[in-house]
């Protein structure tokens, strides 16, 4: 390859990268502009304070409220700290105003399991599921504990017709 050809090819490559980056940025900005202009069917949305923490964590329409619970590192009733990486979850049971929620924790890598030995599949896997019982009328968490432990990247899952939870590892 001649020196002149090399420089022409290099200039063309640099120019195409600059154009592709500009086009990608323009596409991203247009997508954000479109998302910002979408109106809620329930009216305009605005920051709303969490009833548990007082923090503005969500944007909601007028008249809507929420209460957060089961934060990472909160102590559960079984003496275990709530794992992080909250992910897929579902309501598996109801009893009056109480719902039982099973929540996946998509923890990957070599981390110690969070649950007791009796419910741990692999002691060097930090994922699993937790069970939370929440009273929707009182707006408070009633119980929480480890459900399974020692799995990897529990991401998706689903409630079965029998009111149980299937958790799926993302490996």
Regions found by a protein language model. Name each.
Residues 20-60:
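C-terminal segment of N-terminal export signals and the immediately downstream linker at the start
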Residues 5-28:
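N-terminal export signals
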Residues 54-72, 79-80, 135-148:
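Blade-edge beta-strand/turn elements of extracellular beta-propeller
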Residues 99, 162-163:
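Short coil/turn segments that connect the beta-strands within blades of beta-propeller domains
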Residues 1-2:
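N-terminal secretory signal peptides
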Residues 87-95, 155-161:
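Structural signature of eukaryotic scaffold interfaces centered on beta-propeller domains
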Residues 126-135:
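Beta-propeller blade signature
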Residues 104-124, 171:
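Short, conserved, GDST-rich strand-edge loop motifs in beta-rich repeat architectures
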């Amino acid at each position: 390859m001649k020196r002149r050809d090399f420089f022409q090819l290099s200039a063309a490559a640099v120019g195409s990268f600059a154009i592709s980056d500009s086009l990608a940025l323009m596409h991203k900005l247009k997508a954000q502009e479109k998302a910002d202009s979408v109106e809620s069917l329930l009216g305009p949305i605005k920051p709303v304070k969490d009833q548990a923490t007082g923090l503005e964590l969500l944007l909601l329409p007028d008249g809507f409220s929420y209460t957060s619970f089961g934060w990472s590192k909160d102590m559960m009733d079984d003496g275990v700290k709530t794992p992080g990486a909250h992910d897929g979850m579902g309501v598996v049971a109801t009893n009056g105003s109480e719902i039982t929620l099973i929540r996946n924790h998509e923890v990957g890598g070599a981390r110690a399991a969070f649950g007791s030995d009796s419910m741990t599949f692999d002691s060097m896997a930090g994922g699993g599921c937790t069970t939370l019982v929440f009273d929707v009328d009182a707006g408070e968490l009633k119980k929480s504990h480890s459900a399974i432990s020692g799995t990897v990247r529990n991401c998706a899952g689903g409630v079965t017709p029998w009111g149980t939870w299937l958790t799926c590892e993302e490996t």
